Amino acid sequence: TIDSFCLYVIRNHFHEIDLEPNFRIGDEGELKLLKEDVLAKVLLKNYEESAPEFLAFVDGYASGRNDAALSGMILQLYEFSRSYPWPKKWLPAAAESYGIEDEASLESAAFMQSLLQNLKRVSEDLVALSGRAYKLTQDDDGPDMYAKALEGDLKKYKEIAASESFADFYQNYRNLSYDRLASSRGFDGNEEKLELVKKLREMGKDAVKKINRQYFFTSPEIMAEQMKKTAPMAAELVRLTLEFDEAFTAEKRRKNLVDFHDLEHFALNIFVDEETGKVKKTAEEFRDNFKEIMIDEYQDSNEVQETILRAISREERGEYNLFMVGDVKQSIYRF
């Protein structure tokens, strides 16, 4: 497993990351209690300091005298951040993404560019899906009575795929409507093709519903307003998460404990320089040990694991010896 590999790397190169050689992996219960204890101390310290930003955060998310919701948010963000190669860089960047002033700054935000790429891709998939259905209506034994409606679908999907902004995608997806299919009474062609065309069309409709739920639950204008209002809370959540991370790391070091996320991050630090992103000598040495690297259940890999395995692959030499097998539909990281 990736964990056993990381453990092997650390056992043999612990001195490169200033780690005591007699470390041990904490059990789940022990680490859970330690997290709770450390987080309680972090929150107590912040209650005592009573900074306005912290008190506003508490007022916004705590329930009466119960701050369990706050603790849950901090721990959830902490765990999520550990799936990224450099959590202490990722967390502040995540908070900065809320620095939205208006709809224009929302459109130009870095995360929005990635989102637009996803929307463009799924829209092009809809074009391909609809095109396949329309093509079936053109077959000699195909359901030609559906051709007009399918041609309309195809035209609309192409218009959506040509959208250049989030606002355009929002308007085009939210306003999308479909013509009714003509009656198939008296059809004497291929029944399988008729059913397939209807199935493909429904698949497209279902995909559009999912896209609207996932991306267009509110207008870009309201989204920008909400992000602007949420920015101070996001910044405070990130600050508390980083403070917890530092305290928890220090306590684990004091007890000479590591968890499974630590194994991955320690191995990553042995292989890759955080500041430059360049592969270290140790990783280059490991490259010569593997003719091929094969990853099964790739959909369950996180970015830390992928960075580790790419570091010991020979891609930089132009030798592509890294192979993955997986099913994205089963991914446990489909957040």
Functional labels for PLM-detected ranges:
Residues 51, 56-67:
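Alpha-helical transmembrane helix bundles of large polytopic membrane transport and channel proteins
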Residues 3, 12, 16-18, 174, ...:
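Preference for short coil/turn "hinge" residues that link or interrupt alpha-helices
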Residues 9-13, 38, 164, 173, ...:
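Alpha-helix boundary/capping residues
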Residues 13-17, 39-50, 65, 78-85, ...:
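Conserved NTP-handling cores and scaffolds of large molecular machines
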Residues 37, 68-258:
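Conserved ATP-driven helicase/translocase motor core recognized via long
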